[in-house]
Amino acid sequence: MMVINSVVVGTVVASKNVNEFEFVIENQVIDKIKKGEFVITKNTHGDYLLSKITKIVSVNALIGDKSEDASELAKIRGVIYSEEMLNNSSKFLASAKILGVINNESGSIESNVYPINVPQNVYLTKDDLLAKIFSNGSIEVGYLKVRSSTKVKLNAKELCSRHFAVLAMTGAGKSNTIAVLVQELFEKDKGKMNIVIVDPHGEYVKMRNTHILPAKLNPILVPEEHLAKLLGIGENSSVQKSFLVYAALTVKYECKENKKQISGLEYLKKIEEKLVECADKIANSEDKKRIYIEYYDGTRCRXKTVKKDDEMSINRVIEKLRWFINKNKNILGENEGMFDIKSDKINVLPLQKIEDEEAITIVGEFLKRVLKERIKSVHDEIVEIKALEKPTLVIIEEAHLFAAKNLKDRSGYWINRIAKEGRKFGVGLGLVSQRPKELNPTVLSQMNTKIILRIVEPTDQKYILESSENVGEDLLQDLPQLSTGEAIVVGSSLPLPALVKIKKYDGVLGGEDGLKNLKI
């Protein structure tokens, strides 16, 4: 493969180190050169170097350091030099970052350790070389912004197995990006891998080839401490929490002893019955100082002394339990339908009608089951969910809600587990967020490919930089200037970071701007 293009675009005039250089752009090709363009030079070892233009400035030797003095400039332009002389003395100086040595056979890029000679020619990179670098994957997401003829294709295995994140401010195009990724993955690997989208706002339910998974909350699978949180029992309400735990453990123990299986609404109703029994016993007790109740702790029966004042606390728990049941009656029940995953469909788990805490619990239980089933599959154990014999990619929208910084919630715990262990068991993660700084930094750092669309908030930019090894300051500087649908793609699924124009998804999404037709 020939590396050198016949088009000379400039001459090297300075080389600061082995990582960067400056060159003067030839006037006749200035219209072909722009920031982000790729160019070729040689190092002193004779290797071809691929570099990217990071800055272009205009300089004029006749003006020199007088460019900030308005009166001096006026004299220069009107008296000392003619406009023609000034124009002829104007040059464009480009700064370039050396990306590495080009392997002439494979097109791969290796680190450079040699300086470059001054002066020497700078060449425009050929399309076929850029295609060898950026079009070698199977997942086409768009094209290079600086070279629309070069398609950008990601490595599907690296993208899914090593996890990815799509980060953007609202309206920058993240939903379209996910739709493009999912459709490409579905069409290229149909039936080989499960794809599930956790969809808090119903943005993806209208996509082609979707299969809707009904979101269900089975409270018997929820730890008692977390059930208290769902009911709105605060951390400081220790008495209320203790009575809820006593009642829940007792119900579970009695069902086990009677070999009776219950779940969903029936489980909560049984807890309510136990709490009512306890409150009635306190209310009807003649001995106001020594009142005993019995409960099971999961292994045996225990007795507990309660006070008359505890009746009020128990009644408060009953009120909260009834409120919770009434609010969530449509989602309480067996959750087996939530795992009716179809390998030949794009599976969507819509959560738009569910409150945050309940959604967090549902997602936590879903991720837990997916990971545990995949672990069984890898260890050749019997898998209860047939589809989970295959590798599975779970894409989570509004990921900052489910993987917040403290990881206290159940969803955060399982997202962290999958981020660290999922690759071994064939579970991939895709996290999508418009609030990067609210994501757990450990989880974000495990996302080995990042697709970053427009972000203007400095704290978000800094947070991305701190949690990503392969995102540099030079890339972050471009984020505020990106247009809708433009993204910086960096990580293991692409050989080099690239500024990409994401292609348009050719179907229907449900998350369009609700105010777009408003006339003001």
Curated annotation (Swiss-Prot):
What UniProt keywords apply to this chain's record, in alphabetical order?
ATP-binding, DNA-binding, Helicase, Hydrolase, Isomerase, Nucleotide-binding, Plasmid
- What highest taxon heads this organism's lineage? Archaea
Q: What is its EC number?
A: 5.6.2.3, 5.6.2.4
One Pfam family this chain carries?
HAS-barrel
- The enzyme class is isomerase
Gene Ontology terms, MF aspect: ATP binding; ATP hydrolysis activity; helicase activity
This enzyme catalyses: Couples ATP hydrolysis with the unwinding of duplex DNA at the replication fork by translocating in the 5'-3' direction. This creates two antiparallel DNA single strands (ssDNA). The leading ssDNA polymer is the template for DNA polymerase III holoenzyme which synthesizes a continuous strand; ATP + H2O = ADP + phosphate + H(+); Couples ATP hydrolysis with the unwinding of duplex DNA by translocating in the 3'-5' direction
What family does the Swiss-Prot or TrEMBL record give for this protein?
Belongs to the HerA family.
What protein name does the entry list?
Answer: Probable helicase MJECL08
Look up and give the organism this protein is from: Methanocaldococcus jannaschii (strain ATCC 43067 / DSM 2661 / JAL-1 / JCM 10045 / NBRC 100440)
